A protein has these predicted regions:
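An N-terminal domain-start capping segment
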Residues: 128-132
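N-terminal secretory/targeting leader peptides
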Residues: 2-3, 7-20, 25-123, 133-134, ...
Length: 362
């Protein structure tokens, strides 16, 4: 009996000693190393810093068990190659705007940006509670991708120009950097539209390769240096009223994760979505003050005639995209029905209150 007890104690001591020589996380479970590719330049505001923060959050919430290495554009794949890289398993996840892939998968436009479409809050409501997420999953499933919303900057600006634009005629021959469905709207107005990656916009403007460019809003645009290369800053960004950025995850990887890890990533993405919008609003307030203080810069609205023309062509473009295939039609119908309902509610709530506040504080 004493011999058996002694042997058991020796065995337990050996096990404890071995465990003590390992880092704490390794005792519990192995570290899972993942790769994230993005469509943004290193340290670019606001997109890349949000992607980096999301990766850190997932690592922290998992107690280091999920370790994500982030590769900005061109470090592993190009800015517009992230979707295909994750689909093929070259990378585990991407951080990008799905409007970059709308020519490949038309329905994806509705989960990113639609001219004169939903704002950030409205889009989040449709995705979370209006059937949008289920449709998004259906759209991405054939490409082996699980999509989640992880960023939104809110209503964007209309862009920087090297001259005033007062009529549709001013867009004819204009070389303009713009992605997504808005690009097709301007193309129909006679503009020469290019989808230049964000990191190349300044060079293109300085060299004269383009005459105008939209990026995001005051905070991001100042960080990029757009205020140093153009004088006319137009609003509103009719083309991107609330562009959502996607965390696209390889579905084979996703399906192999424990339910707790799927929930962890979903919660982290949702938290970053909320934080990114709050951060962008706060930083845009400060950046707009800087721009207003620069007398060289003219902050101007697109006039009513231009807005009407943008709207007319946007309706054409969205209708044509919706007719591309049955699934895109299904997505478009859901999107437009939700938009109609939330616009009705918004007139009584958000718009109604803001109009009242303007009157009260004027």
């Amino acid at each position: 009996m004493k011999t058996r007890r002694r042997d058991a104690l020796i065995g337990a001591a050996a096990t404890a000693a071995a465990a003590g020589s390992l880092p704490a996380p390794a005792i519990a479970q192995r570290v899972k190393e993942l790769t994230m590719v993005t469509s943004w330049s290193e340290n670019s505001i606001p997109y890349q810093i949000s992607a980096d923060r999301l990766a850190r959050s997932i690592g922290a919430i998992s107690d280091g068990r999920l370790k994500i290495t982030v590769y900005p554009q061109n470090k592993l794949v190009g800015a517009f190659e992230t979707f295909d890289a994750v689909s093929a398993g070259v990378a585990d996840m991407y951080h990008s705007g799905d409007n970059y892939f709308g020519s490949k998968v038309p329905a994806l436009n509705f989960f990113s940006e639609v001219p004169f479409g939903m704002t950030a809050d409205e889009l989040s409501s449709w995705i979370a509670f209006g059937g949008g997420q289920e449709l998004w999953d259906e759209v991405d499933a054939p490409f082996n991708i699980k999509p989640l919303s992880c960023f939104n900057e809110g209503v964007q600006m209309g862009g920087w120009f090297n001259k005033e634009v007062n009529s549709a005629a001013d867009f004819k021959g204009l070389r303009y950097r713009m992605p997504g469905l808005g690009a097709e709207v301007l193309r129909r107005m006679g503009a020469t539209v290019v989808t230049t990656p964000g990191g190349e916009i300044i060079t293109a403007l300085k060299s004269g390769a383009i005459d105008a460019a939209e990026w995001v809003g005051p905070w991001a645009d100042i960080a990029m240096g757009l205020d140093k290369v153009a004088d006319y800053y137009y609003y509103p960004g009719f083309h991107e009223p609330g562009t959502s950025v996607t965390l696209g995850i390889n579905k084979t990887l996703w399906d192999g994760l424990a339910a707790s890890d799927q929930a962890l990533i979903t919660v982290a993405a949702g938290a970053e979505l909320t934080k990114s919008l709050a951060e962008s609003n706060a930083e845009n307030v400060k950046a707009l003050t800087v721009l207003r203080a620069d007398k060289r810069i003219k902050i101007l609205p697109f006039n009513d005639d231009l807005i009407r023309e943008f709207a007319r062509l946007s309706k054409e473009v969205v209708a044509e995209i919706a007719a591309k295939d049955p699934l895109t039609r299904k997505v478009a119908d859901s999107y437009m029905a939700f938009l109609a309902g939330i616009m009705d509610w918004g007139e009584l709530s958000e718009t109604g209150y803001r109009n009242t506040r303007r009157l009260a504080l004027s």
